[in-house]
Amino acid sequence: MGGRLIDLGVRGAILAATMSAAVAAGQTHKEFRFNVGPKAGVSVNNPYGSISVKPSTGNVVLVNAVLFSDRVEIDNNVAGNRVELESHLLAGADAQSGRVDYEILVPADTSLSLHSSSGVLRAEKLHADVSLEGSGATVEVRDINNAHIHVKTLNGPVTITNVQDGHVEVDSLSGNVTLNSVTGPLVQVISTSGGINYLGDFGDHGDYRLTSHSGNIEAIVPDSTSADVSARSVRGEVHDDIPLQPKQHTSFVLKQGSAFWGTMGRAAVSSTVVLRTFNGKIHLRKRSAK
């Protein structure tokens, strides 16, 4: 009996390895190279699969793509200083057979437009405008400075990390949004039911607007933060763990437990922070000392 079980186990392992090899055999690797000038543009439309973009050296765009079957092709076009890539689905393609995973290297000053319905959209270490859009895609942006960042998702989570001097706009239906060390003249998040988490100091002289209809909003800030903060939840609760200098004149009634408005830090350099939700909770608290 024991020998038979071992034999079945060996057969199972061989079958799994065979199936894995068959899947891998159905994949195709393609590489593209495009020479571009300064401040080029790259757009990628990929219905199924991930897109990852990092900086390259020199004025060249390098594309490494993995196609998961022969039911999808890659169309490419160069128009002036702009490179356009599109995953072209053939008859019978579905989310698995039509999948393409892209790894792309671009000059750091290249503007991006990335679209995928699923997978991961990732852009990092650039200093140019970035637009990322996907229904269920996971969006990750990090280490981007002096740029406009536009993100639009339905239910995919969004994480933006270490962005300085950015114009950041995030529009999400139900995905959770996390901003970690994100500052700039404009930082705006609008969500219908997703939660919003901000970790950072709100910078200097910026305009920060975090709004969710039914999701919770949490802002965790250090002692050095200077900000004029107003928070209001129509049907939910608000909590403030940081002493604020109350505003003398406000545009709405400050009902205990559902709204607050005050200044923390140095008013002369403070950013304007607006936190709004209809029936979610809002929590402003101090970052724990490590």
Model-derived features: positions:
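Intrinsically disordered, low-complexity terminal regions
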Residues: M1-K290
